[in-house]
């Protein structure tokens, strides 16, 4: 999901058109305005007092031979999208709005021809290693060179560059 959302955003912002105004925000919306203000603590449909912890067991029919759901070959394990966090996440109670998860904020052209993303300094990989701009650029470029063909076709002409 992380890579998919990241790439969706890049595709939206890679259109070659004249730049209009420059927007800077924590959240952004493709349709209208984001529902939640900067610094919101939880989505309205989430119970922040819900018990935390425990074990979740999910069943799946079939087999898998890959944890990389974007690989050209093989059968990925069910729910592998839960292994990856996106730069931005969506809310379930509004369409087309994106809120930072690994990202901290975004700066972008009003016509979505480019986007600059600041990463959350607290963002970490599962092993505790900080996520860097180089990691994001590496992931995108890996998809462009070794990912599924649809990815390369969809994001043709899109570039990602780590600037910090």
Annotated model-derived regions:
Residues 1-2:
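N-terminal secretory signal peptides that target proteins for export/translocation
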Residues 5-14:
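Bacterial N-terminal signal peptides
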Residues 20-111, 118, 141, 153:
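N-terminal lobe/hinge region of extracytoplasmic solute-binding protein
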Residues 123:
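Short basic (Lys/Arg) and small-residue
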Residues 135:
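Ca2+-coordinating acidic residues in Ca2+-binding motifs
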Residues 142-147:
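A short, polar/charged loop-to-alpha-helix boundary motif
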Residues 152-164:
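Surface-exposed binding/hinge segments that line
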């Amino acid at each position: 999901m992380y890579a998919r959302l990241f790439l969706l955003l890049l595709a939206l912002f890679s259109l070659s058109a004249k730049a209009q105004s420059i927007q800077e925000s924590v959240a952004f919306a493709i349709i209208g305005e984001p529902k939640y203000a900067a610094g919101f603590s939880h989505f309205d449909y989430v119970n922040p007092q819900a018990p935390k912890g425990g074990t979740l067991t999910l069943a799946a029919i079939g087999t898998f031979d890959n944890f990389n759901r974007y690989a050209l070959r093989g059968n990925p394990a069910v729910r592998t999208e839960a292994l990856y966090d996106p730069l931005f996440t969506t809310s379930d109670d509004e369409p087309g709005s994106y809120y930072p998860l690994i990202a901290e904020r975004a700066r972008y052209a009003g016509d979505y021809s480019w986007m600059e993303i600041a990463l959350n300094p607290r963002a970490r990989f599962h092993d505790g290693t900080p996520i860097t701009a180089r990691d994001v650029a590496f992931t995108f470029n890996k998809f462009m060179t070794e990912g599924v063909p649809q990815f390369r076709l969809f994001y043709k002409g899109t570039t990602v560059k780590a600037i910090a």
